[in-house]
A protein has these predicted regions:
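Small/polar, glycine/serine/threonine/aspartate-rich low-complexity segments that form flexible
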Residues: 21-23, 69-101, 228-239, 271, ...
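Acidic, low-complexity, intrinsically disordered peripheral segments
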Residues: 6, 18-21, 76, 211, ...
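Amphipathic alpha-helical coiled-coil segments
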Residues: 43-58, 130, 134-154, 171, ...
Length: 439
């Protein structure tokens, strides 16, 4: 009976695991899943914990160190005179408790604590930066899948139209209203449209596979994205001003905070290097005792009787260090200048990125508005030409050209629409740090 029970439990567990994984994913579900399971992010979170341990260690360096030592020795004298009252075997033990405390080191340890805290913060910012990169990759893939998915529908509609034209052309050929060459051209066009549809479906599968890889899903898992119902309206939403996005991004983005911390670390590194010229004051103290056999005194009596203690202070004043301190200070100043240049470069790169997002969003939104009108015009023109073709008033070339114009208009509408959606998403993300859900 145990095997059937085990099989039922395993099946129930598998069913539950499968039920927890959706087959149709929203943008937010993709982001949440990736942020939880991405290896780079999880590795970064471990690095944060490691940096926190370093910070605790640097803070503990302010405290005195304490150590306990004990030494035990056994002795043996095999040729001792038999008339002696002393034992041939002897034992001695030493016990010591020692403490060391650096009272002053030019504030080096304080500076090290500050640097450790900054490194800790930078480790967290690295996780945030990687998180942002992953979210940008996800939204790009998600929008690309939406675009190709709708493109597949367009190609399917075009193929359906071509097949209808083949059927009508076949009827016209039977009654002598269409030549064999024109019918062959209609059939060739239908075959081309079918090829384009298959190609679009293949591209869609490739992007879905990339998304599965990014989400760390099994390649055989069912996966599709939730198609928003209001994407047309969202593509026509107001575009946030580039200056407003830049101001928010410069204050919020982790790469800018990283660059600012690098500058602060550079300044503190100069202070640390200068401590090489500072004197160091340290205190040392200890207490100890010892015991031995052969003295006629018990171990318990020897412990307090032999107790001894010491207390000392060490003052270390650097006089000449073969220019090592000066070299360290100069190199720290150069590193600070490099950090300032990197911050300037990061600022400029971020500004150019946001400006590029804004230009792409604005341009493609205008293209989308124009493309919507072009699709309506091309659709009306094609339907009119189709009717005229059936009446024998238009030839096959004019019909094919009209269909090509319609397809190009539809593709232009889709491309501009989803490109606008992508850059609108990125602008909002750089402004407030959140991806807006597609409705």
């Amino acid at each position: 009976m145990r095997k059937p029970i085990l099989a039922v439990v395993m099946a129930a567990t598998l069913h539950t695991a499968m039920a927890d994984t959706p087959t149709v994913w929203t943008l937010q579900q993709c982001i949440d899943h990736a942020l939880q399971h991405n290896i780079t992010l999880n590795t970064g979170r471990l690095s944060v914990l490691s940096a926190q341990e370093d910070t605790r260690e640097s803070q503990a360096a302010l405290l005195p160190s304490l150590s306990l030592s004990t030494t035990h020795q056994l002795g043996y004298q095999p040729f001792m005179d038999n008339g002696s009252s002393a034992d041939k075997a002897s034992y001695s033990g030493d016990y010591g408790l020692n403490a060391n405390w650096t009272v002053w080191d030019g504030k080096r340890r304080r500076y090290n604590i500050t640097q450790s805290e900054r490194i800790d913060r930078q480790a967290q910012l690295t996780v945030e930066e990687n998180s942002n990169n992953i979210q940008e990759q996800i939204v790009q893939l998600f929008v690309q899948i939406l675009y190709i998915n709708e493109s597949v529908n367009v190609h399917q509609e075009i193929l359906d139209i071509s097949r209808q034209n083949v059927l009508r052309g076949t009827e016209m050929y039977r009654v002598g209203k269409l030549s064999k060459a024109d019918l062959s051209q209609l059939e060739a066009q239908a075959a081309t449209d079918e090829y384009n549809l298959v190609n679009a479906k293949g591209t869609l599968d490739e992007y879905k596979l990339q998304m599965k890889e990014l989400l760390r899903l099994d390649y055989a898992a069912d996966f599709d994205v939730a198609v928003p119902s209001a994407s047309d309206r969202q593509a026509l939403a107001d575009i946030p001003p580039a200056d407003r996005v830049m101001t928010a991004a410069l204050a919020m983005r982790p790469e800018m905070q990283q660059a600012a911390i690098d500058i602060e670390r550079g300044k503190t590194d100069i202070d640390i290097a200068r401590t090489g010229k500072m004197p160091t004051v340290a205190l040392q103290g200890g207490i100890g005792t010892n015991t031995m056999t052969g003295t006629g005194t018990s171990w318990g009596s020897q412990m307090p009787d032999n107790m001894r203690g010491s207390l000392g202070v060490t003052l270390s004043v650097p006089l000449s260090d073969n220019r090592s301190t000066k070299t360290a200070v100069n190199k720290a100043k150069l590193a600070l200048q490099q950090a300032q240049l990197k911050e300037e470069d990061a600022r400029r790169s971020l500004q150019l990125t946001i400006q590029g997002f804004w230009i792409n969003a604005t341009t493609n939104q205008q293209r989308y508005k124009a493309a919507k009108a072009s699709v309506v015009s091309a659709q009306d023109s094609y339907e009119l030409l189709g009717e005229q073709f059936r009446l024998g008033l238009k030839n096959i070339v004019e019909l094919t050209n009209a269909k090509t114009t319609l397809l190009n208009a539809q593709q232009s509408r889709l491309e501009s629409k989803y490109t606008t959606l992508l850059y609108l998403q990125l602008l909002h993300f750089y402004e407030n740090g959140n991806m807006e859900s597609f409705n």
